[in-house]
Amino acid sequence: MKRYDCTFVGDINPDIVMMAQQLPVLGRELMCDDFYITLGGSTGICAGVFGNLGAKAAFYGRLGDDFLGKFTVETIAGCGVDTSHIRVDHGCTTSVTVSCTLPTDRALMSYDGSHKRLAPEDVPLSLIDETRHIHVGSFFLQKDLMPMYLELFRQAHQRGVTTSLDAGWDPTENW
């Protein structure tokens, strides 16, 4: 029997959500209606929901050694996700997204600190043997891992492990 139902690889960070009726104007301060800080990163959110459903999940990712990194690890662990494979990087700050959320849409601004430091050595191919499914998220934010993903998926399929890929947004829009 496999240790995990799904192993997640990708972006994880806190989201700071600011709710307002309009976007701020440069040079002025806009008071928002409400705000909250929550688990973010498309892969992190997916893993958190999966864990909250009672499934066995693990996460491979990187966070900074700071308050936001600690918050993120504690939050996803509270969802029942195994965080032992999340690397704490003492040389960078945790990635973060600020969402200016209006009643009908949102505008996002992100800092890509720890995400871009996720490296192939952080994601050993041995994870294949411990899981039934591998989900990779935010493909375009993981530049250093792109070449490895093909081999990860190939070996997973050879061993009967299913896979999924959420490409996410390409900040360069080169798709």
What do the PLM-derived regions correspond to, one by one?
Residues D34, G61-D65, S84-T93, G168:
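Beta-strand->loop->alpha-helix junctions that form or flank phosphate-binding loops
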